Amino acid sequence: MQMYHVVLGCSLAILLVILDIPQASCDDVVIQKRQVDPAEMDRLLDPKRKRPFCNAFTGCGKKRSDESMGTLVEMNSEPAVDDLSRQILSEVKLWEAIQEARVELLRRRQEQLQQQSNQFGAGMDRPLPLPIAGYRRKRFADPESQAPAPHSNLPRATSQLQEEITKPWSR
């Protein structure tokens, strides 16, 4: 019975808390506005004071408001155009050197492949020994059952090898 009173008391307390919450009004909660200094706001929004911009082409440390390649061309000044043309010319020369080195490497590789194919091609003129004939020769002890040499009468040698292979094993 006491458990019933505890559960009833807790339920009543929770009900009172839930019913009391809507009575709180927005006036009771005070929200303070932050004071913003106009000088600080101007400093934050000033386009000249942006953070440095980093990318793969220009690197880091240059501000976005600094002169870029586009503004150099717009200035129509002779030194800026000369600087830009020198930079483009050096990049073109570097690209050409890279391409020439690539062509040279491919040419050398092709020559090596041709030399290797010529070396292997020259060795293909002579007949290769048959490994089965050598194996059979070692296996059989008596000279009559040996297979003939690979360079003599090839069709007869292969037929004899086939006969030896198909013979039943006897001990």
From Swiss-Prot:
Disulfide bonds join 54-60. Residues 1-26 form the signal peptide. The modification Cysteine amide is found at residue 60. Cardioregulatory neurohormone that increases heart beat rate during adult wing inflation; has no effect on beat amplitude. The effect of CCAP is both ino- and chronotropic. It comes from the Eukaryota. GO terms for molecular function: hormone activity. Residues 27-49, 64-171 form a propeptide. One of its GO terms (cellular component) is extracellular region. Central nervous system; most neurons exhibit coexpression with burs. GO terms for biological process: neuropeptide signaling pathway. It is found in: Secreted. Keywords: Amidation, Cleavage on pair of basic residues, Disulfide bond, Hormone, Neuropeptide, Secreted, Signal. Residues 116-171 are annotated as: Disordered. This is Cardioactive peptide.
